[in-house]
Amino acid sequence: MSIRNDNASGGYMQPDQSSNASMHKRDLRVEEEIKPLDDMDSKGAVAADGEVHLRKSFSLWSILGVGFGLTNSWFGISTSMVAGISSGGPMMIVYGIIIVALISICIGTSLGELSSAYPHAGGQFWWSLKLAPPKYKRFAAYMCGSFAYAGSVFTSASTTLSVATEVVGMYALTHPEFIPKRWHIFVCFELLHLFLMFFNCYGKSLPIISSSSLYISLLSFFTITITVLACSHGKFNDAKFVFATFNNETGWKNGGIAFIVGLINPAWSFSCLDCATHMAFEVEKPERVIPIAIMGTVAIGFVTSFCYVIAMFFSIQDLDAVLSSTTGAPILDIYNQALGNKSGAIFLGCLILFTSFGCVIACHTWQARLCWSFARDNGLPLSRLWSQVNPHTGVPLNAHLMSCAWITLIGLLYLASSTAFQSLITGCIAFLLLSYIIPVICLLAKKRNIAHGPFWLGKFGFFSNIVLLGWTVFSVVFFSFPPVLPVTKDNMNYVCVVIVGYTAYSILYWKYKGKKEFHALEESENEQAEYSNNFDTIEDSREFSVAASDVELENEHVPWGKK
């Protein structure tokens, strides 16, 4: 890991070798007199030009709460198990988690390096702007932002749909005569979406909700895992069932294809690792905090999801009953078998439900920031409307509501196909990976020769970039395969149509409108300093810029993470 001093925009300050002790004291006094944005009376911070900015109200733990609250791997495994357990059984999910976690380390490393070099709420589309050749930088940034925003909307839709499936499944478990239909889940989806969208309408509560989501998720994980193991009374499956038994119920004659298609379950559970990068304007020292949050999300996700599935699969009493269940939520059937009572299974299901609320709220936080940041550069129709931060609530409210409107419409896909959930999951994974590879390709084209930030892993970073590119191609191709055979109009995976259609729309919008309106100009040094250093006026940032190099010089040899 390379450790160097970095400025707010990801480059390096050249220290003034002629600085003396009195200069240091004067500069430190200037720094101490700066008024943080958190102390301002307004809900959002008001710059010298009158524009309302986001407040720096997030800490490392609340950023990690947003990151893990969204990725939430053990929860993702639970709610999307229906998309994976029939493609290989427990064995596929266990080994799938290991495979995807290793790949996620590489994805997290790639994103962490870029977020450390260029901390910005735009995330990958901002990195594309900084790294792409001048001739193509605007188009690269636009396509990257367009893919990223689409991925965030599909993530929110798929997460909300998984929660709706869980709720309907809980009712079906206690009412054996009830047969869930698609319209039941659709109605539940829309009601849950309407309820949960209000939590992102007021910014002051978001850090509290984010931190709480982390603790609620971990508490639910421990409670469910311990309860299931304890109530199994030692009646566990043998290791061969968990680690070496392959069950293919997909109709694919090739077991390898079935396994690969089933990887969508753990892949979805480790997606959205860029979430924390879009909070860069709302946290101190984002060049350090964001990479920690990303890698922490992967680490916590692997430990919780792996331990969770091991406990669940050793406790299954009848796999065939789980696969043939009509609840639509296999994890509830596993709880019911382990506890031997539906009331206990419903209680554990409620813990998943509480965890899911934090996950969906984190989804909304993330997608709103992406939409807002992209709209600031005129990347969307009516960008002026979506790029505003509401001065009363302190959040990009218009961007949030517009994104929620799209989720409402995407929910209609579930009425068209019985495998729409699989399509939404694939859309989430594919669009996000496509947005990641654009800046990574630009980084590799520069031979990784950039003014990097404090998080930089050298050769392993290069290896991670290559893995990310290969995984993207693999995922977009294989996760677009039909989940079951024979294929009909009702079970077809329509995500390939969605990806091609949306890409065509983005290119056409760029050609006829975006090319003229999408400015994507780099922010001035003053504006970036205002965000990164938590100043309330541009004048303060100018004063601090004189002091910064000397103050940073004192810490030149302090290891990363200890400054």
UniProtKB/Swiss-Prot annotation:
Keywords of this entry: Amino-acid transport, Glycoprotein, Membrane, Phosphoprotein, Transmembrane, Transmembrane helix, Transport
Chief place of localization: membrane
Residues that bear Phosphoserine: 22, 42
Positions annotated as glycosylated: 7, 20, 248, 341
Gene Ontology CC terms: cell periphery; endoplasmic reticulum; plasma membrane
Span list, region Disordered: 1-25
Record localization: Membrane
Extracellular topological domain: 1-57, 109-182, 227-255, 315-342, 418-426, 487-491
Reactions performed catalytically: choline(out) = choline(in); ethanolamine(in) = ethanolamine(out)
Phosphoprotein among keywords: yes
Topology Cytoplasmic: residue spans: 79-87, 204-205, 277-293, 364-398, 446-465, 513-563
InterPro entries for this protein: AA/rel_permease1, AA_permease, Amino_acid_permease_CS
The UniProt record lists the keyword Calcium: no
PROSITE patterns noted in UniProt: AMINO_ACID_PERMEASE_1
Pfam families linked to this entry: AA_permease_2
GO biological process, one term: gamma-aminobutyric acid transport
Topology versus the membrane: Multi-pass membrane protein
Transmembrane stretches, start-end: 58-78, 88-108, 183-203, 206-226, 256-276, 294-314, 343-363, 399-417, 427-445, 466-486, 492-512
Any one GO MF annotation of this record: choline transmembrane transporter activity
More info: Inhibition of activity by intracellular choline.
Family: Belongs to the amino acid-polyamine-organocation (APC) superfamily. Amino acid/choline transporter (ACT) (TC 2.A.3.4) family.
Stated role: Sole choline transporter in yeast. Also transports ethanolamine.
Protein name: Choline transporter
Organism of origin: Saccharomyces cerevisiae (strain ATCC 204508 / S288c)
